[in-house]
Amino acid sequence: MSGEGSPTITIEPGSAHGLRVAIVVSEWNRDITDELASQAQQAGETAGAEVTVIPVVGALEIPVVVKKATQTYDAVVALGCVIQGGTPHFDHVCNAVTYGLTKIAVETETPVGNGVLTCNTHEQAVDRAGGPTAHENKGAEAMIAAIHTAQTLKSMAAD
């Protein structure tokens, strides 16, 4: 299990009141991405954030929509699921999405929670999606990371 050593930061209920967060979620492997989005939305709303879900076709479409969302949202959560196949396409997609999301966050100074799963098997994805049989909840974790980072940046700006 890869959850060993996970962060312990939590967000107090209601502490993100007034924060606008977009969830950009791909439709490939929808059984996984729907669960990721549900878990992320629940975490955001519990924290008090105003959450908007924006669907995209696949993982490669996530970065451009995330970049646009940084213009109107305080934080963005990127969710998707890329599962290893028999070609190098997996590596290209995973690298492009990860690089794109990191670059967007740094350039725009807008938090981007990365909940794009990159798994070898469907079973690994299920185990990370936050459903009833999952050992991890990457959708909620990405939301918590985005909200916490937004709160941190806001407090740094106030200093």
From Swiss-Prot:
This is 6,7-dimethyl-8-ribityllumazine synthase. Keywords: Riboflavin biosynthesis, Transferase. The keyword Lipid biosynthesis does not apply. (2S)-2-hydroxy-3-oxobutyl phosphate binds at residues 86-87, 128. Catalyzes the formation of 6,7-dimethyl-8-ribityllumazine by condensation of 5-amino-6-(D-ribitylamino)uracil with 3,4-dihydroxy-2-butanone 4-phosphate. This is the penultimate step in the biosynthesis of riboflavin. Its EC number is 2.5.1.78. The active site is at residue 89. One of its GO terms (cellular component) is riboflavin synthase complex. GO terms for biological process: riboflavin biosynthetic process. The keyword Transferase applies. Pathway: Cofactor biosynthesis; riboflavin biosynthesis; riboflavin from 2-hydroxy-3-oxobutyl phosphate and 5-amino-6-(D-ribitylamino)uracil: step 1/2. One of its GO terms (molecular function) is 6,7-dimethyl-8-ribityllumazine synthase activity.
